[in-house]
């Protein structure tokens, strides 16, 4: 059965692997790039309080009707570090999230810079989008965070290897493979307009096959966990498909999705949402299944005379405890990720049921519930599979003589 699933996954990868032409056709780079736009880095020399071009505005949201929305801005004096303008000093406006990010002198920004000549060339095509003021100023694309992110990554890798040793190192290799699958298969296939559910099923299955065998070794124990994981993935896919359809979710629950929808018509956003639900549930699902399989094997090693049924019953007691903690993990993870949304909806002062039916919060609810159902069902499935694959019990006579079942 497992061999058939692995073979089907390989066939699915071949059939769903996106062509380079399809991805290029859907790419946004050529369609929305502005000729002459450069992205130099710049060091902050000083930050001064300033005013936005539109310091305040009246909100169009009926929940905040008549209330002014104050926009605080700072002005940063910066020195451009690279490109044709290296060494040049200029000023940029810091608004929105940049004012709350704790920027200080010597921090590095990524700028958007359009030369005067390029602005002249683009003026005919962009109409009034390029003004005289915009030609002589630079915008901030974001903060350069390479160094702190690299330090965090190094610390993470060091801790994993120090504690997990060889197993930890193999887990990092497996994590790298997972990232490659997402970058080179899942994302391009979604961009090319493929089915989100099919892409998630094939991609998640391929990831789990490699990750489990690489991180935990090739054994019957790992195979039991893999079978349980693959069944859990299938359950999550089916539940997610039904949940997204019946709750009438569009998949456009955040600003990024709406911006993306305005730029391309190739992506199926409901499929994208379904794919995201499945991929997001992989980690905790894998955690539960590998733990259950290990519990079954350790119970057999500790009590070789127990029958498969007795081991299944005892392993399910362990599994129920794991289910409780895993459910908390899922709920708190999604609640933490959606904290800003929760605060915003709280400020609306609406009944809780009304709040929960908003698209952005409904998406989080569907993600949590779908992952939770798949996780809970994977526990008994994995337990039964692992117990079925166990070597038979040792008779009391053989157990007294020190005989032990052969475990792998």
Regions found by a protein language model. Name each.
Residues 1-6, 146-152:
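Membrane-entry signal-anchor segments at the cytosolic-membrane interface
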Residues 1-18:
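Hydrophobic alpha-helical transmembrane signal-anchor segments
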Residues 21-145:
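Extracytoplasmic/periplasmic regions of membrane proteins
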Residues 112-114, 126-141, 156-168, 186-192, ...:
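Short juxtamembrane and helix-loop transition motifs at transmembrane-helix boundaries
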Residues 154-259, 267-274, 280:
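Transmembrane alpha-helical segments that form the functional core of multipass membrane systems
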Residues 225-233, 262-279, 325, 329, ...:
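Pore-lining and gate-forming transmembrane alpha-helices of multi-pass membrane transport proteins
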Residues 282-349:
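Helical hairpin unit composed of two closely spaced alpha helices linked by a short loop
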Residues 333-408:
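Hydrophobic alpha-helical transmembrane segments of membrane transport and translocation systems
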